[in-house]
Amino acid sequence: MDGFIVIDKPAGLTSHDIIARVRRILGQKKAGHTGTLDPFATGVLPVAMGEGTKAIPFLDEAVKEYRATMVLGAATDTQDCTGRVEKEGDWTRLSVEAVREVFGAYIGKCKQIPPMYSAVKQGGVPLYRLARKGHEVEREPRDIEIHSLIIDRMELPRIEFTVSCSRGTYVRTLAHDMGERLGCGAHLSALRRTRSGPFDLSRAVTLDELASIKEQGAVDSLLLAPNEVLGHFPEIELSDEEVRKVYCGVPPRCHGRCEESSASQNDGKKVRLVQNGKLLAVAEIGQAESGNGNKSLRLIRVFN
């Protein structure tokens, strides 16, 4: 079984728990996920199986989309509803305009300090382990990007919003930081991921639904092939001879098939090597060869 299945993760389970249950339901040994979700969060968790696991590293930069609810007036140690209230503040004098102004200030590229309750490692130790012992350490701010931040509903102290963001963005930290900026504190009370790169809720199934579909022998209807999942990479169709060479570790030549093959800006760009819709490999465009200007390709990952 090779490809991806999108699980609608329930609250209360870790992403690792989901992988263990999917393996058990499908009898699949080789499985992994892309894009960890906090235990209290729900929604899109892409699970890769078999050869699909080879595609995971190429999905790291995928844009994520979430629906979230934040509550003003209380900041917690975990920055969400599972934590202990550390600080309370008065939100009653806040205007709708002030809230909208703060939301607008976070759109674009910015720095974010990862929360103590996270899997980010410092000195080889996950921060959450230090946090559970009552330790707080300095963390380096990380570059993130908020592509869009839309208020869906505002009934203070509750604000429901939709955010589209880059990898590595902690939505609960975003809520916490906006609460600090508003001067009253805030925490996240609900978080649901609606999209992760090419995966969205329209293709998601619950664990119970997956078990039922497995009993019906229809799991293949859920599978997203690696070639579809990596559709954001340009495609190069290979001949039979080129396929044989790829499986021997020899990459094909571009021969004009790489977009703007004479442009140096394409150096390092990744492409899919396919035949008849089947993904054979992911390759990287190299520099042009001297004399003929033809670009070279370097194999990164070969799929069986």
UniProtKB/Swiss-Prot annotation:
Gene3D superfamilies: Pseudouridine synthase. InterPro entries: PsdUridine_synth_cat_dom_sf (IPR020103), PsdUridine_synth_N (IPR002501), tRNA_psdUridine_synth_TruB (IPR014780), TruB_C (IPR032819). GO terms for molecular function: RNA binding; tRNA pseudouridine(55) synthase activity. The keyword DNA damage does not apply. It comes from the Bacteria. One of its GO terms (biological process) is mRNA pseudouridine synthesis. It holds the Pfam family TruB_N. Responsible for synthesis of pseudouridine from uracil-55 in the psi GC loop of transfer RNAs. HAMAP family: TruB_bact. Belongs to the pseudouridine synthase TruB family. Type 1 subfamily. This is tRNA pseudouridine synthase B. It comes from Geobacter metallireducens (strain ATCC 53774 / DSM 7210 / GS-15).
